[in-house]
Amino acid sequence: MKSASDKSKEITNKVKKLLEEKGKEPLNAARNLIFKNKAICKEIRDALKYFMYEYWNDLTTPTLLCLSCEAVGGSAYQVKHIAIPLIMISGAIDIHDDIIDQSTKKEGKLTVFGKFGSEIAIITGNFLLVEGFTLLNEFYNKLPRNKSSHISKIIMNSLFELANAEALEISLMKKLHNGKRVKPEEYLQVIELKAGDIDGLFKIGAILGGGSKAEITLLGQYGRYLGMLSILRDDLMDLKDFREIKHRIKYEILPFALLCALQNFYVDSNTFTFIKFLKSIKRVNDLWDVVIKSNGLKKHKELMEDIAAKGYSILNNLRYRKYYLKLLLDFLTLT
């Protein structure tokens, strides 16, 4: 019988292999197309080269499109061409998000903002947006009008949700640092909105694969749950990374588990005390003491289990190639 550690490694390796198999070709195509533009100045070209080849490796976008398409009986080829512009747009959002969050480094690597400054980062993100939407428009012209219109509305809605999520997160962060209590349920709204992009990817894949209205809706719901699990898993990972969690305490909203811990401080004036305490922490273990003793970690894991259960239940109503969709849920619930 395999140990929990061996099972975790097996699932992780399967997901890595899946991402490489489904995502590598579209990602490389996106990289090649970007650098065909000869009008890019050296400063932007350097930033793009760093971002696309050294910092960022978006295998996720094309993989999720592919899995959704296959889940309704379609093939990877049907989503190949839309994956390229969506990779670019996703990259632009990532660059701009780092500026908003003042993130100069992630996972040991400098962000574009951290390496080149805010001005170059903004322009680089804008370039990717323009390139992405230009290619997206070309793709629309090759589709039946009803499909292109449907996909366009989904993409716009996903972008609006992301924008609303950022605005709400900034509002909650300011509220927290002004000594007001932020409830975990308020942050959960941010998580649900941020998961809108994954919801959108799964709907698009299902549309291009010829899925029924019911299948498109189901896969969108699955994508929403998957996106929420990914964010909550990142929250837990941040709690293990001292540099990242100190940055979040200073510039971003607290992870869900810490907001649950904050509920022990019912009086608004005590929120200052809690934030001051978090800023004074010198070791990751001290943070874990807080989230464990306050039941914050327990509530965090219970939330993830509840969301995962909803995701698994959706798989019962899908007809094709559900194995990889289950694998992703298994991976995101590893702790």
Locations of the language-model features?
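Short, well-structured alpha-helical segments
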Residues: 45, 49, 80-83, 152-159, ...
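Aromatic-rich carbohydrate-recognition surfaces in CAZymes
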Residues: 118-129, 135-136
